[in-house]
């Protein structure tokens, strides 16, 4: 584990076969980047889907520290989240889905909470 005041964001994805996937995914990633240095890494655990893999591998994460993990088993949200936590390097994690966005102040007070709850 690294700095105890950083957060790993876990993003499990089952499929890209949603009509608005690319737009949702882009907005989600931008909302993560807007959190600043508090987010140390983005861990994407995605299902073995060629369309999804093509999109993720061609996406410009623009300097965001990204770990990619292909989930080969039957899609299972909880197992994908657990795998993301296993390979994350921060003491703190946050979960987001591809069709969600963090508000610009989502992690604003996180440093205060991390100071209080060090363990």
Positions of PLM-derived features:
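The conserved acidic donor/metal-binding loop of glycosyltransferases
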Residues: 97-101
